[in-house]
A protein has these predicted regions:
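RNase H-like, Mg2+-dependent phosphodiesterase core
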Residues: 4-187
Length: 187
């Protein structure tokens, strides 16, 4: 009985379609900010006004397989999407927080549709031109466009780390994706 009730509650605990009701909004999120290695990736996603995909969620809550399935759906269904990247060399020069914002700005720059507003996962953001923006703590678990951006940023970064793992197999990046692990702490 309890499991059934939890499933029903979860079924109706869907992400919100939009923060700004009358503006074309882009959701943004990053992946790689807490990593020891690799670039930081960010995605910007504009979803259709009437879009509803109950499977969308924070990428960290989804399996690798499910993230990749949703990635294909997002890329197909989105009005516009783009990914921005900041290299390790740039991160070393400007710091990881500024690099995260720069990656988001690069993703927004690459959109083929200009948003009228931006919503971002987190507690702060560097303004993007004159667009209104809102930073939303745990936004990837609250708004569909941020969740979609979370999924794209994570999957594109994972692909990049798997490519690095093929070139540098001794770091185990295909499994840890550059994040610190117990193995790192023991090493």
């Amino acid at each position: 009985k309890v499991l059934l009730i939890l499933r029903l509650v979860h079924k109706f605990d869907m992400l919100q379609p939009h923060f700004y009701t009358n503006l074309v909004e882009a959701g943004c999120d990053e992946a790689g900010r807490g990593c020891l290695a690799g670039s930081v990736y960010a995605a910007a996603v504009i979803l259709p006004r009437d879009y509803n995909n109950p499977a969308l969620n924070d990428s960290k809550q989804l399996s690798h397989k499910r993230r990749n399935e949703l990635r294909e759906q997002i890329m197909h269904d989105a009005v516009a999407w783009a990914v921005g990247v900041v290299t390790p060399e740039e991160i070393d020069r400007i710091n990881i927080l500024k690099a995260s914002f720069l990656a988001m700005h690069r993703a927004l720059d690459a959109l083929n549709v200009r948003p009228e507003a931006v919503i971002v996962d987190g507690n702060r953001f560097v303004p993007y031109g004159d667009l209104p923006y809102t930073a939303i703590v745990k936004g990837d678990g609250k708004y569909q466009s941020i969740a979609a951006a979370s999924i794209l940023a994570k999957t594109f970064r994972d692909d990049y780390m798997c490519d690095l793992a093929r070139r540098y197999p001794y770091y185990d990046w295909e499994h840890n994706m550059g994040y610190p692990t117990k193995k790192h702490r023991e090493g």
